[in-house]
């Protein structure tokens, strides 16, 4: 039923909104997150709908922004509010709400009461031209909770919606608290079939309800307390508590002629779509002042807006309270402007902020953002994007691997699927697709390829004269094994599943729980079946784990006994760690050393100080095209030698196919020291486009104050690894030498020459590099 049954008196309520320019809002000196670098990924959801993740490094930290754009001119697309399919007013996760209702994407929508399993959206809801619900309590004295509307002609607009509804007979008029909204029933509420067909659900939630059944402007039935009644198809029900009936509505009887008078700022009967939100964000392209309900500071945020021409809808979620800093009201306004919004409003934010989409690549409804509470909050409703076009013929094919990095002898399964003109995904059986691997040898079995040689390879898929390809890499060797738990404690009869991770020579991780060979040192204590250990008797032993020559041990203790001693496993040497001797072979050679100067408070004998520094200088300046001093250096190099010394500020050098950037992290990270370095080093590296990248810093990323910033650096560097570049991060810090390889990036720490007490550090180590034709080797040289 489209219209609310009863008489409607219309009146427009216009809310005043203060529009702000940057200067009038903040004044001079007020900062917002300035972007230094950004990484974007874009996916297609369906024709006319795109999803983009924009991960930005700002001077305030990482800011992850999720945006969906919808072309409202696409005739097969719809935007509409959705609620629980299970029970009216039941809170569900955004993913479930959208999936159950058949949407392809969407976000959380309106504000609601957090307590309990049931609630009601604050704002008005119109779906497919049907008035679903509306509240009477919002925006009475000021515009606080905005709502979006699209009329039957497709015209979008925003309004601080207000409504009042009165129900009465000739004796008394009652003010209604809501229409199909039942967060509480202190005051009477209107109910029709757009919410439910009978009152059984309400009777379970609220005790002793009394219902007036109304048809043709007449009360046809008044229920007993708690009695379930049927909602008439062409009428409505007024629901109230027994106390309210007794104290304020006792003058109503069966047969009374009644009237329903409704006044609202927008005629809902003329609307095709409506859903509620928070304060307005943009009006006429300008950012508004934040009203009293908009949370202050940087928070997780959800926003919705439309472009000036009304052709594009913009959904946005900004992650917060985790690795991402969130956004202020002002920053959210700037972001919505950047993505093309002219009119916009807040939707519910904080723990509710959720974006879900089924992209062509994902193939299933997936939460795209990082929800701030670690798991999805149950909310009252969501705004869904719907594709109404039926599945058509395949227009293109795509290919996806189960892993971007493969190992020799281990299968990689590819998925080949088709897309129609609306990007509906169509699965294709393997026997209809021709698969081929170029660059490495191996064996195909359906969609699974098991490589037998290493290297870069291309997989092509051909179906009905359409093709797709994937470029990947096969690692040649297992470098090390790492069990999730290197010790296990059990009782007799208990079992333990062993989770095993394999790292290849470039530090890429592969799961190897079931493909690793396990052998128990003392089989009397326990046995292995695949990757499951079963404890047989009390005692302690070691499980030997073997894969492709790599070995690890897990200590198992059964009962209250002393743990067995674990065998020592030799460290695996990096394949690029080789002897480097300068020759006239066309290669480029450079040396890197850590901090030489002493900056402590102890007194050092002048001769000892000079001799130690001179010895280091003789090593670093010799047999190289360039000498790099990654820590404070208080002695000059020979003028004829190309060199770069640490100054505590950003520096960059491009030589011999190598990009070398010095980035200061003195204060616990790049951002805390000088955030502009992000823009500088990424721009310089991309402009130089060298195949070898060396980042020198004065504090190892794992020790930065912000783990989010360290993770962002790794993501940036991994992007260069994916381009086939060799990447090194050399920290000049503390008193020990160490190296590790992770996801293709080599992390090396060079210790300081001097201990804090003024003695020479015997662990002092420098690096010698050789670079030629994209091939890199390095040697760690201890200088004693």
Where in the sequence are the language-model features?
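Active-site neighborhood of phospho(di)ester-bond hydrolases with catalytic His/Asp-centered motifs
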Residues: 107-109, 344-347, 591-595, 621-632, ...
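Acidic, histidine-bearing metal-coordination/catalytic regions of metal-dependent phosphoesterases
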Residues: 10, 529-530, 536-540, 544-599, ...
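Gly/Ser/Thr/Pro-rich low-complexity, intrinsically disordered segments
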Residues: 6-11, 29-570
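Active-site-proximal segments of metal-dependent phosphoesterases and phosphodiesterases across multiple
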Residues: 316-329, 691-732, 736-737
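Beta-strand-turn-beta hairpins that frame and shape the catalytic cleft
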Residues: 62-63, 72-76, 306-313, 578-591, ...
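Divalent metal-dependent phosphoesterase catalytic cores across multiple superfamilies
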Residues: 559-649, 710-719, 723-725
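Conserved beta-sheet core of the metallophosphoesterase superfamily
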Residues: 363, 709-778
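Binuclear metal-dependent hydrolase catalytic cores centered on His/Asp/Glu-rich metal-binding motifs
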Residues: 656-693, 703-715
